[in-house]
C-alpha cells in the first residue's frame, strides 16, 4: 500500500493571461486550478503515493470543477469540508526577460478563508498518514484558516505524523490584522521539516543569511547554513531545514538549487541553469513534493532526497500550469545527468 500524505490549504481558480500579455492587454484568461498544498498533493500522486488534500470548497459548479480537477489527478478528497460562497481566485501575468510576473489575489470571503475550527475531522483525515504538510500561505488568508491549520498540526503531532511546512511568505495576503510573527511561530513549532528561502526566513522570522545578494544572479549555498542553524535553534522540534536557492538572472533565466541541513551536515544539490522558463508558478511546491517523496523513499539518504526535489522542481519550470506533471522516471533521468531534452521515441 502506498504511503499516505495529507496536505491542507486552498485550491483556487487560476486565471492567467495568455502569451505573456499584460493584464491591461488581456481580453481573455486561461482558466486552470492550483494552490500551494494542492500542487504538492498532485506531485505526490504522480510519484505513486496516496495524497489526501484537505480544504473547504463551495457547493457550486466552480467548487465542483476544482474537486474534479483534484480527482482527475488521483488526489484523495475524502476529508474536504463543503460550504461558503465562493472559490478563491488568483490572476497571473507571466513575465519575461526583465519584466517579472505579477499575481493579483481575489481570496477574501472564499470558502477556505471563512473556515472555522471544528469543520475538519482531523482524527479521521490523519488516520494512517505518515506525513502532514501545510504552507505559510494558508494562515495568511484568515484567522480561521490559521486556527484550523493549527488544529491539523496539533493532531498530527499527537498521532506521531511527520509535519512539514513551506514558509511561503506572501506580503499581499496578510490583511486580517495579524502579521506572520504573530501566527507562524506556534505553527512552525510543531514542524519536523521546514522549507523556505532567503526572503521567507527574513520576513517571517527576521533571520538573515550572510553574504547573499540574489539580485546579482548568484547565490552561495554555504551562506545558508547559518539560516538553517537559526531555524533549528528557534524550532528545536525540527530535524531538517531546507533552503531553496534561486538566482534570478532574469524572469526567463534562473539558476536553481537547494541545501538541506540535518543539524550536523549541510547537503548541497547540483545547480541547474533554467534558461527558458515556461512557468515558474508552483516551482517551490514541486520542490516540496519532490522532497516529501524523497525523504519517504530514500529515508537514509538525505542527499538523494534533496537531489530529487531540485531535479523535480527544475522540470516544473518547463511545464505550464501549477501542477508538476512529471513521473519519478523523468526526474531520475534528469538526476542522472540527461538534460538534453531530446525526443523520447
Residue spans for each PLM region:
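Positively charged, low-complexity intrinsically disordered leader regions
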Residues: 1-22
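Short catalytic helix/loop segments, enriched in acidic residues and glycine
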Residues: 22-40
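Alpha-helix C-terminal capping segments
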Residues: 32, 40-51, 92, 294-298
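Conserved N-terminal subdomain of the carbohydrate kinase-like
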Residues: 50-137, 331-345
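Hydrophobic beta-strand scaffold residues
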Residues: 51, 77, 163-164, 195
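A short helix->loop->beta-strand "cap" motif at the edges of active sites that frequently abuts
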Residues: 157-162, 235-239
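Conserved phosphate/ATP/ADP-binding segment of small-molecule kinases
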Residues: 173-263
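Conserved post-catalytic alpha-helical subdomain immediately downstream of the catalytic base
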Residues: 267-338, 345
Amino acid at each position: 500500500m502506498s504511503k499516505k500524505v495529507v496536505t491542507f490549504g486552498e485550491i483556487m481558480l487560476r486565471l492567467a493571461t495568455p502569451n505573456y500579455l499584460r493584464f491591461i492587454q488581456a481580453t481573455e484568461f486561461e482558466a486552470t486550478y492550483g494552490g500551494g498544498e494542492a500542487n504538492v498533493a498532485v506531485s505526490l500522486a504522480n510519484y505513486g503515493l496516496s495524497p489526501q488534500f484537505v480544504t473547504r470548497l463551495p457547493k457550486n459548479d466552480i467548487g465542483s470543477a476544482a474537486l474534479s480537477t483534484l480527482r482527475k489527478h488521483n488526489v484523495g478528497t475524502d476529508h474536504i469540508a463543503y460550504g461558503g460562497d465562493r472559490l478563491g481566485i488568483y490572476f497571473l501575468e507571466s513575465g519575461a526577460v526583465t519584466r517579472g510576473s505579477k499575481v493579483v489575489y481575489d481570496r477574501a470571503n472564499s470558502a477556505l478563508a471563512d473556515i472555522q475550527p471544528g469543520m475538519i475531522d482531523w482524527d479521521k483525515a490523519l488516520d494512517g498518514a505518515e506525513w502532514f504538510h501545510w504552507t505559510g500561505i494558508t494562515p495568511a488568508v484568515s484567522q480561521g484558516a490559521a486556527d484550523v491549520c493549527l488544529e491539523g498540526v496539533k493532531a498530527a503531532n499527537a498521532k506521531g505524523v511527520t509535519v512539514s511546512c513551506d514558509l511561503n511568505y506572501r506580503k499581499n495576503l496578510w490583511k486580517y490584522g495579524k502579521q506572520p510573527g504573530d501566527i507562524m511561530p506556534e505553527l512552525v513549532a510543531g514542524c519536523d521539516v521546514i522549507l523556505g528561502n532567503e526572503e521567507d526566513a527574513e520576513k517571517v522570522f527576521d533571520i538573515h543569511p550572510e553574504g547573499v545578494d540574489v539580485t546579482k544572479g548568484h547565490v552561495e549555498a554555504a551562506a545558508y547554513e547559518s539560516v538553517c542553524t537559526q531555524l533549528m535553534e528557534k524550532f528545536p522540534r525540527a530535524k531538517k531545514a531546507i533552503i531553496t536557492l534561486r538566482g534570478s538572472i532574469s524572469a526567463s533565466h534562473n539558476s536553481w538549487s537547494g541545501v538541506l541541513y540535518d543539524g550536523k551536515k549541510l547537503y548541497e544539490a547540483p545547480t541547474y541553469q533554467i534558461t527558458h522558463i515556461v512557468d515558474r508558478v508552483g516551482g517551490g511546491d514541486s520542490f516540496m513534493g519532490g522532497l516529501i517523496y524523497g525523504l519517504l523513499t530514500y529515508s537514509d539518504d538525505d542527499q538523494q532526497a534533496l537531489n530529487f526535489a531540485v531535479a523535480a522542481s527544475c522540470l516544473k519550470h518547463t511545464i505550464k500550469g501549477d501542477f508538476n506533471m512529471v513521473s519519478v522516471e523523468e526526474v531520475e533521468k534528469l538526476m542522472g545527468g540527461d538534460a538534453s531534452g531530446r525526443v523520447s521515441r
